[in-house]
A protein has these predicted regions:
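Signature of N6-adenine DNA methyltransferases within the class I
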Residues: 2-199, 216, 230-234, 297-306, ...
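Segments forming glycine/polar-rich beta-alpha architectures that bind adenosine-containing cofactors
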Residues: 5-12, 26, 155-305, 418-451
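Glycine-rich, acidic and aromatic/proline-enriched surface loops and short helix-turn segments
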Residues: 12, 16, 322-329, 378
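Active-site-adjacent structural elements in folded domains
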Residues: 49-51, 333-338, 390-396
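A short, contiguous, amphipathic alpha-helix enriched in charged residues
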Residues: 84-92, 240, 245-251, 311, ...
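Short, ligand-facing micro-motifs at secondary-structure edges
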Residues: 98, 285-300, 318, 327-338
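Non-catalytic DNA-recognition/assembly elements of restriction-modification systems
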Residues: 238-246, 348-451
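Basic, amphipathic alpha-helical recognition segments used for DNA target recognition
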Residues: 307-349, 360-371
Length: 451
């Protein structure tokens, strides 16, 4: 390795290899480079280059700039990588190009969503963020006081997984995981054929709502046997055949955690089914301005490809489908390829909701949220995927969302937000305040317990 003093700059385009497609050798290299830090097994290959460079430039005036996939500034990877970069190696980001789309000719012109991050082991007063209004277009430069790991002009905060929301809102959970080998699930055609053979099973067949069905208006069904009496099941031989197949599937698994559920083959592995809930798809296209969310009841079984907010209200719906929440999603949410991969522990539980609102503000959000739902109902033949496609989104739905956005913004502050960057600066400040308040409350609780 050359002496550090010989280099003014290190510039590179490290390999774009995601954590799920790395070889074992590459994964071992990453974990080793991170000195076996907890969670390092989920990191992309490029993160090892960042740590390697951070170690190499310690005590020097060398500046580094890497082109990387944007996964390192979103989702669970961010706090793991930048926790080390900031706190162990005292790295400061000097400039950053926020997400842009880059066509990789070496991979058949495949689109890659990238960032460029310039950093050093010393600070500078001259920092710049390059923002892309159009991710396929040109950037415009914004001067910044500080650039945090999410490439926002805000303090160096790290959004880590939390098991509970930082605000007083319903706790989000996953939908219901079948773990059944497909034997408790039915397509629309399979349901019709099944009921021809066993009409008495009708009461146990419920709509199954996965992210795909929800967004595309498709139908799927499941056997929901949670309240089935043994005597009833004995009279349903076709149902019992499927239950037997579930038992065999679970017993055949190499995972002990799956095998133990063979003792309850009539049931889904995970069962989270409140009487009413808001459904949020776990994965959705990044091209949509808003993540479509919806209301469902106890007879609509949410699949584990969705998150649910039990007993969510129109107010919760309005905030979740607002531009304010979407700005948080775009900056904090992890990705599956380029699609949003919503996380309850990182995105929802850390989201700073507007607090201490007067009754008229809450009612205002509810009224405008209801209007969004009413406009959707005008298009019964269009799926949510159609309604929220940027090219086909109806103008009245666009208008309904814009009115909701403006009102939700006013729940946070009187002045409008001039850009997404300004929204995120505000949300990070609010996040810092809320989490500081939580820390103080927890400290008081612990002190009282000691007394």
């Amino acid at each position: 390795v050359a002496e550090e003093s010989k280099f003014d700059y290190i510039i590179g385009n490290p390999p774009f290899i995601g954590s799920k497609i790395m070889t074992q050798s590459q994964r071992d290299s990453v974990v080793r480079e991170f000195d076996h830090v907890q969670g390092s097994g989920v990191l992309d290959y490029v993160t090892a280059w960042y740590i390697k460079a951070a170690k190499y430039i310690q005590g020097t005036r060398t500046k580094v700039a890497f082109v990387s996939t944007n996964s390192i500034v979103q989702g669970e990877q961010t706090s793991i990588l930048w926790g080390q970069m900031l706190h162990k190696y005292n790295i400061k980001i000097h400039f950053a190009h926020r997400t842009f789309k880059w066509s990789n000719e070496a991979k058949g012109n495949a689109a890659v969503y990238c960032v460029i991050i310039g950093f050093a082991s010393f600070d500078t007063p001259n920092k710049s963020i390059f923002e892309y209004e159009d991710i396929k277009g040109e950037a415009h430069e914004i001067k910044a006081k500080n650039i945090n790991p999410y490439l926002v002009d805000a303090k160096d905060l790290l959004i880590e997984k939390k098991s509970n929301p930082i605000c007083n809102v319903p706790k989000m959970s996953f939908g219901n995981m079948p773990l059944d080998g497909g034997h408790l699930l039915l397509t629309d055609e399979e349901k019709k054929e099944f009921l021809k053979r066993e009409p008495d099973a009708k009461k146990f067949i419920k709509p199954l709502i996965s992210a795909f069905e929800f967004l595309n208006g498709e139908k799927r069904w499941c056997l929901w046997l949670i309240n089935a009496e043994p005597s009833e099941l004995k009279r349903l031989p076709e149902v019992l055949k499927r239950v037997e197949l579930v038992k065999k599937f679970r017993l055949a698994s190499v995972a002990p955690s799956t095998q133990k559920f063979s003792t309850s083959p009539t049931l889904f592995r995970d069962r989270n089914q409140p009487s009413t809930y808001i459904l949020v798809p776990s994965t959705t296209s990044e091209n949509r301005k808003y993540i479509p969310v919806g209301f469902f009841g106890k007879n609509d079984i949410a699949n584990n490809s969705c998150h649910i907010v039990p007993n969510g209200t129109l107010f919760h719906f309005g905030i979740l489908t607002s531009e304010m929440h979407m700005a948080w999603v775009r900056s904090i949410c992890g990705r599956l390829e380029s699609r949003f991969r919503y996380s309850k522990d990182i995105v929802y539980n850390n989201f700073p909701w507007p607090q201490d609102l007067p009754k008229q503000k809450i009612q205002g959000v509810e009224k405008l949220a209801q209007q969004v739902l009413k406009v959707r109902e005008r298009y019964p033949d269009s799926s949510l995927a159609d309604l929220y496609d940027p090219l086909t989104m109806p103008t009245d739905l666009v208008h309904a969302h814009q009115e909701l956005d403006k009102f939700v913004d006013s729940c946070y502050r009187h002045l409008p937000f001039s850009s997404e960057a300004k929204r995120m600066e505000f949300l990070f400040e609010l996040y810092e305040k809320y989490t500081a308040d939580l820390f103080t409350k927890e400290k008081v609780k612990r002190t009282k317990k000691k007394v």
